[in-house]
Structures are given as structure tokens and as C-alpha cells.
Amino acid sequence: MYRISSFKRSAPQLTLGSIALAAVTLTCVYFQAHFAAAAFAYLLVVLLFSLMGSFIASSALCIVAIAALAYYFAPPAFSLRIDDPRDVPVVVAFLIVSVVGTYLIGKLRQEREAARVAAAKLQRSASDLEDREKRWRAIFEHNPAMYFMVDEAGIVLNVNTLGATQLGFACAELLGQSVLDVFLEEDRAFVRKCIQTCLEDVGQSRTWDVRKVRKDGSVLWVRENAKAMLWAGDRPVILMACEDITERKQTELALQRSEAHLAHAQELSHTGSFSWNASTGEAFWSKETFRIFQIDLQTTPAPQLVIERTHPDDRASVKEIIDEAMRDLRDFEHEYRLLLPDGSVKHIHAQARVTRTASGEIEFVGAATDITAARRAEQQLRRSEAYLAEAQHLTHTGSWSWDVHTRDFVYRSAEVDRLFGFNPQEPVSLETIRSRIHPEDLPGLQEVQRQAIDQEHERFEYDFRVILPDGGIRRIHSVAHVVVGSDGNVSELIGTHMDVTEQHAARERLENTLVALRESEQRFRDYAETASDWLWETGPDHRVTHLSEHTSAAGILATGLTGLLRWDIACDMEEEPEKWRQHRATLQAHLPFRDLIYRTVNRMGSPIYVRTSGKPFFDGNGNFLGYRGVSTDITATIRADQAEQELRKAQAELAHVTRVTTLGEMTTSIAHEITQPLAAILSNADACLGWMARDVPNLAAARSSVEWIIEDAIRASEVIRSIRALAKKGEIEMVPLDINQVVRDVSALVTRELVSHQVTLRSELASALPRVLGDRIQLQQVIINLVMNGIEAMDAVTDRPRELLIQSSTDDLGYVQLSVTDCGVGIAENDADRVLDPFFTTKSSGLGMGLSICRSIVEVHGGRISVVQKNGPGATFQFALPLHKEAIS
């Protein structure tokens, strides 16, 4: 076979080689090549073509080449004879090299052919082995599991493509690496221990769940099935088949997180879940349900436990609802109370739905929510509403809202009905209300409202009278403002009605008192001009023996007093017996006395007050002869003191009425300050129920809503406390006060007034001010009066910002000083000295008593109030109060 193949190759080799030699010959002849160069060219052709065929063909080409070399290039030309002896070695060398070269090449070709045949056989064997390996590799690669083969040191010997690609590697990247590198670092010790267990029990399968780490750092869960076996040379290896259980684990973890979140949500929202199989009686309670009912977690839940924990007053209704739900197989929802072992009470809202299990059994699934906090918030809300109603009742102020289009009330508080003499519980028509308004006042009231609507007055006021069913007259002062709708037109009027009957009566009483006071002052002045002291003398028996003639001439004392005892002419024996007992004891002891004051009557029978002092006198032997002394008619002084007390009382009543009136004028602000937190409480309570009613309650939002409810309730309570304090009529209570805190309290009350008048309040309060001794309510009244005056003074200001400045400081004399500065129209120079006087006012309405009352209050506190001239527009009122003694020390 080899010879035939060699012969087949010799013919084309010889033919092509001859053609090549001819071409080389022509080329060398053409270029007149040297003998040696031609020999080298022929040698290359012979050796080149010896690669194609047999040694015989190569030898033939060699002979042809020598003949051509001798014939064409060795002299003589065209002859086979070689004359030049120098060419003979070249020919010999050519022959040796070509023969040896072709032989070696032929030998090499034989060896290559033998190697090729052997390789073909080996290739066929390898192909068979490869086919078998491919079949096993296909099984290994296409198995839907990750396969690893590792040695006893944990080095990866083999891994299928799925095992590598699942981890984001190429197979070559894992071979030779430690299998522990593909496991999560926290799990490597566990895997090492599992591999060691497999090596200890060769042939025994082991299974475990563990986490692996992909090349990109992501984690997947796998279930490892591993078994150790003996490999070549009895060397142990571990075969590991891995199943990806990431989704299953994620589902399990998600379920665990969901259960944990549900448990936290139930704990935060105080909502427990439960289920109850109506057929088997089996029940399930969540942990929060056990906590709500305060029952041990080890206790088997049952409906009877609910009945036992239920408040005795609610037990019958709860049992009835459960029985009806069982009988009719229907959903149920109800609220009831729990009476816990510690005596506390909880309010529970429970609801359940009827479902069917996979086996078709009836089961109730529901939730029980602890709504105790919500119930308490509702109670607080109702209390706040009651506080608002009480505040309006105390100040005799009602609030209302009037729809301009329907020309009827949208809202009116119960106090409005009371002001008109109606029962708030009974419906009242608009015509009935109008019938109570005094006929003389109704047209004017309607005209004021019409002008406010037409001219869109932001704020307007008016007064009218109400005729009560008993015929009495109640005077009402109303403050209101317009509300502009989205269409730019007035849609609503909102305002307040204030009962100022007491204020009006107090004003009349004050005017009458002032008239009487002037008459009394004139009368006392006449008394003072005509009265004088007189001398008197009594005997040993203390009877009057002598009076100066002036008393009779002036008619100071009644006639016929001689011979009477002093207590016989006194008119206050029964009123002050102790005073007279002590005086008689002094006389019996013959001791001097001073400034005994008693009441008697003058010649006209009118009561007078006498102040007398006396001294005993004796004869030369020391015998007691009686008393001599001097008396003074102090009726004018006593009556002046009494008049001053009456005046102070009238001023106190006027101050109280002014406070109440100020509160009435600020009712819109106060109502806003109270209704704003009340509305927030309602909104937050509604939001809380909404958060709780979701399929998955939003506990964080519900908790925030409850916290906001508490904050708003506290804010409303603080506002009402301040209103009650200002409206209260009581004695002056002098206590150490922080004047800055008093300013802050007032700022909270007048916030709405500032907003409605577009006034900005700026406070510059000195820090660490010493305390003053004063009555909080009266000082609040002073500051409110100054602030309200400042606000009203800026109503006409349109060319600059309306700003009110309150400053506190200490002056050089050690007084705490407070000033209120506005940027209004200011005070005329000729009015500055009179602005603090009673009944002086620059307003179109009012008595002019506000600043006078402020001065009286400040002076009672030992302070002073004044008007400070300022360069710019507006006015500054300033008052200073002495420090509290403890602050001085």
C-alpha cells in the first residue's frame, strides 16, 4: 500500500521537477549565471521536490540536474565533458548533498507516514473514548442540578456548566480553587464541617441548606446533597449535587418577615388577630390578642375566655352577638369593654368574617383592636367642645355664620340662642329671631350688613337691642367680617354676638357714681371748711362737765350732752363692743388715751365721726378729778375714705367689665384658637381610624395621629384656661411674675386680631429679667389694652407695614420696664398730657377709660405709666414696675 502510494507520487514529482529544472536552466542561461550559482539553484529544486515523492524520483531529478549542469554551464558548453578541474568538486558536492538530502527527506517522510497511521489508529480510539465522554459529559452538563467534585482538601476537581454559570463563573475559573470560596463567609465553617462528616462516612449521603455567593456578590440559597467516594488510587473525593432553593428560601424569609411585621404592626396598633373554627371549636390568637386580653401565651384560646374577660355590663350583649354569628354563620362587628384582673378597663373593637377552610369547614377570621386611647381622645374632644361652649357662656358671647345667598344662618352656637332668649335645644326660625330685635334697631342692623357686603368690609361692628320674653332689654355688640368666595364675591359673614348689657349698666352706674362722688366731695369740702377741733372735760364719774362753746355755735354736736357719758352719746356700742370695753378699762385705770374714733350724731341728727384724745388730771393730793382732752370731727375724712373705697370698687368692676368686653371683642380670635386644635383633633381622629381600618394597618401613621390629638387637646385646654382666668372676677392676687411670660400669654390671645388687622408683632424681650410682684390677670389686662390700642391706631395705615413692637428691659432705677410701640397715626402734642386721664379718648366710640384703668392698675402695683415721644410715626406707651423683694435680695 505504501509502495503504490509512493509510485503514484513519483510520476508527478518527476514531471513537475523536470519542468522546474528546465525553467531554472533557462533562467540561469538567460542571466548567464555562474556554474556554482546554477548548481545551488538546481540543488534547491531537487530538495524541494523530494518532499513530494519517493527517493527514486528524487535521485532521477538529481542525475538530470548534474547532466544539465555539465552540459550548459561547465566549459566546454553544450558538452557533458568538464574541462575545468575547479568545477569537479562542485559537481561532486552537488551529488552528495542532493543524494543525502533526498534520502533524509524520504526517511523523514516514511516516519511521518508511520506516525500518521499510528495517529489515525489512536485518533479512532480517542474518538470512541471522546464519544463516551461526551455522552457522560452531556449527562453531567445537562442535569438540572449544580454538580461539583472536590477532593478531600476541598479543591474543585470538576464542575458542570450549570454549577459554574449559576454562580457567574466559567468552569475554568473554578477548577483548582477551594470550593469554600463560593460559599458565604459566615457559612464556610459549617460547610467545612459537613465535608468532614462526608469523608468520615464514605458512601453515606448528607443534605444541608447553605448560602453561596455569586461572582457579582449576590447570594443564593442551595440544598446540598453530598456523598464521598473513592477515586483513582483509592483517593477520596466528594460529589456534591446542589439544588437552587433561593426562591423557596426568599418566600420563607418573606413569610417570616411578614409575620414579624404583622406582629409589630399589631403591637403598635394594639390590634390582635384571631380565628375560630365553628365546627371543631379550635381557635387561634395572635400574640397581641393574648396581650390585649392579658392572658398567658400558654393558655389555649377559646371564645369562653373572651366572655370571662368582658365587662359584666357588656357580657350579655357580647355573648348574644357571638351566638347569633354562630347560628346564622354571618360576619359580625361590635365594641365592648374588658375588665382586666388589675381592675383597669379597656375598650375593644372586634370584627370577624365568615370563611371556609380547604376542607369546607366554617371558620371565623377577625381582629380585635384596643381603642381605649381613641375613646379617651373622643372624651377629651367632647371636653374641649364643652370648654368652648363654657367659654362662650362665661363671656356671654355667641358665634355665627350667615350665608349671603340663602340669607340664613349656616351655623350659630347655642349661646346665640341664649342671647336672644331661646332654648338652644329647640329649633328657631329666622323670622322668630328677627322678631326679638328691637324695631328701632333692625333697619340699622340690616343696613350695616348690606354695606359690609356691598363694600366688602373686612371687619365691621354694630350694636342692637334684643327684647326678651319677660320684657327685659339685652344690649348686643356684634363684631363680624366678610368671607369672599372663589368667584370674588362675598359669600358669607362670620361674626360674634356679645352681651354688653352689664357693660352698659356699669357705664351708667359709673356715671352716676361719679356725679355722686362730685357732690360728696363738695359736701365734704364744705364740712372741712366749717369744722374745727373742740375741747372737753369730764368729771371723776366720766360724765361730760364742759364743752367748748364752738361746738354748740357750729352745731357740731347735739345739744344737752352735759352730764352724759361718752358711750351714752356713741352710736357704735353694739357694733364695736370690744373697742368700748378697752376704752372703759383705760378710763378706770386713769390712763391717757389717743385717737379713739367713734360715731355719734350732730345737732341735725346726722351721723358724724369723732376722733378724741384725753389725759387724766388730778388735784394737789393726787385725787383723780377727771379727763381733759380734744376732739375732732373727722366725718369728712371717713366719708372720703368710704367714697374712695366705693370708687376703687367701681374701678375694679369697670376693669372686670373691660376685660370681659375685650374678651368679647376677641371672641373670633379665641374661637379660632380653640376651633383650630378641635378641628385638628377631629381630623387626626378620623385619619387614625382610617389608618387602622386598612387591610394592613399603618401603625406608624396611626400612632402619629394619636400623638397629634394629644398635642392639640393640650393646646385647646391652655387657651381655655387663659380665657377663664381673664373672665374670672376675683380679688387681686399678688405673686412673683415673669413679665416676659405674661407677654407671651397675651401674644397667644391676640394672634388672630393681629392677623385680621394685618399687623406684624415683633417682640424684643430681655433675657433673665428679675421677677416683679403683681396680679397676672391685671397685668395681662394692661398689656392687652395697650396692644389692642396699637392695633386700632394702625387701621388707617396703608403706606407702610403695620408693625407692633413689644420690648422689655430694666431701667436705671431698677424697675422692670415694658413698652408697646405702634407705627400708627400717633398722639398729638396737646393730647399727650391728657391721654391717661379718665374719659379722654380720640376714638369715635368708647368711654376713654381703658388707659385710665391701665394707669390705676400700674399705680396699684407701685409702678408708673407714661407716653414716650418718638421721632417716627406712631406712639409708644411704657410702664415700669418695681422688682420683687426676693429678686432684689
Swiss-Prot record:
Cellular localisation: Cell inner membrane
Where does this chain mainly localize?
membrane
UniProt EC number: 2.7.13.3
Q: Does the keyword Lipid metabolism apply?
A: no
Q: Which residues form the Histidine kinase domain?
A: 669-885
**Which GO molecular function annotation, any one, does this entry have?**
ATP binding
Which residues pair up as cystines? none
Please state what class of enzyme this protein is. Answer: transferase
Alphabetical GO biological process terms: phosphorelay signal transduction system; regulation of DNA-templated transcription
Topological type in the membrane: Multi-pass membrane protein
Bilayer-crossing regions:
16-36, 37-57, 60-80, 88-108, 155-175
Give the record's GO CC terms: plasma membrane
Catalytic activity as recorded in UniProt: ATP + protein L-histidine = ADP + protein N-phospho-L-histidine
Function, as annotated, reads: Member of the two-component regulatory system NodV/NodW probably involved in the regulation of the transcription of genes involved in the nodulation process. NodV may function as a membrane-associated protein kinase that phosphorylates NodW in response to environmental signals.
The protein, known as: Nodulation protein V
From which organism does this entry originate?
Answer: Bradyrhizobium diazoefficiens (strain JCM 10833 / BCRC 13528 / IAM 13628 / NBRC 14792 / USDA 110)
